[in-house]
């Protein structure tokens, strides 16, 4: 029996979002042994329980108030939302924030030798998918009449098996489509992982814990998107150097011993710092440029 005084978080047991969800919780300082087969894991240092379940169960667990929070792909969340609305329900939940992992797209795909001139090419076709409501919403908006073939896995084999004329499935690289003689023809939904919260009154202690967790998640994401930059920069071109490095705050400038022409500059900059930027810095006279990862960050 779960203790209702503890914060309950549902994550995917295995699959696309599982490892990233576990890493996020670990980097937030939540100490949990998630390497066993247990479906419920208790945090050692916080009043938090982690439920490891199928990804398509997570939205329902949150909407029904069984758990307090869930980490889930927006595609699965939206499909559950549309399913419940089609059944006359009024699902309630809050999206606390979008996360920085789990990116994918839900796309239409057809045989490589089939002509495609837009969604109208699917009129009267049978389409295999695990996302019937997302597919219906999109094609209804396009005025396309079609037949849906619901499959919960191996959707990409449906055309070759004679089950469907086209498919609507998640695409990451497109390699699976290519291996099955298909090509991506239209993106109908783009998704990332998100953190959702159940509707209804939350005990003050739980809400305070959620607020703490959100602050830590924000810090983890900012740290992943940022780098700590150190360099020696010429004083006469300092403004040009700073302009190349987008940062939340102004850099720290320190004098160099015995050098009046240069200063040491330290700053936190976004992940958009690529080799091209470093080459531009060098061209401006910067030297000893170091780019370091950030473990934790709080503004």
UniProtKB/Swiss-Prot annotation:
A GO BP annotation: L-histidine biosynthetic process
Regulation: Feedback inhibited by histidine.
Cofactor(s) annotated in UniProt: Mg(2+)
Predominant localisation class: cytoplasm
GO molecular function: ATP binding; ATP phosphoribosyltransferase activity; magnesium ion binding
Enzyme Commission (EC) number: 2.4.2.17
Keywords: Amino-acid biosynthesis, ATP-binding, Cytoplasm, Glycosyltransferase, Histidine biosynthesis, Magnesium, Metal-binding, Nucleotide-binding, Transferase
Catalytic activity of the protein: 1-(5-phospho-beta-D-ribosyl)-ATP + diphosphate = 5-phospho-alpha-D-ribose 1-diphosphate + ATP
Cell compartment(s), UniProt: Cytoplasm
The keyword Transmembrane helix is assigned to this record: no
UniProt xrefs under Gene3D superfamilies: 3.30.70.120, Periplasmic binding protein-like II
Metabolic or biological pathway, per its Swiss-Prot or TrEMBL entry: Amino-acid biosynthesis; L-histidine biosynthesis; L-histidine from 5-phospho-alpha-D-ribose 1-diphosphate: step 1/9
CC per GO annotation: cytoplasm
InterPro entries: ATP-PRT_HisG_long, ATP_PRibTrfase_cat, ATP_PRibTrfase_CS, ATP_PRibTrfase_HisG, HisG_C, N-reg_PII-like_a/b, N-reg_PII/ATP_PRibTrfase_C
Subunit architecture: Equilibrium between an active dimeric form, an inactive hexameric form and higher aggregates. Interconversion between the various forms is largely reversible and is influenced by the natural substrates and inhibitors of the enzyme.
Entry similarity comment: Belongs to the ATP phosphoribosyltransferase family. Long subfamily.
NCBIfam families per the UniProt record, alphabetical: hisG, HisG_C-term
Free-text function comment from the UniProt entry: Catalyzes the condensation of ATP and 5-phosphoribose 1-diphosphate to form N'-(5'-phosphoribosyl)-ATP (PR-ATP). Has a crucial role in the pathway because the rate of histidine biosynthesis seems to be controlled primarily by regulation of HisG enzymatic activity.
PANTHER family per UniProt: ATP PHOSPHORIBOSYLTRANSFERASE (PTHR21403:SF8), ATP PHOSPHORIBOSYLTRANSFERASE ATP-PRTASE (PTHR21403)
Protein name as it appears in the record: ATP phosphoribosyltransferase
UniProt source species: Enterobacter sp. (strain 638)
Gene: hisG
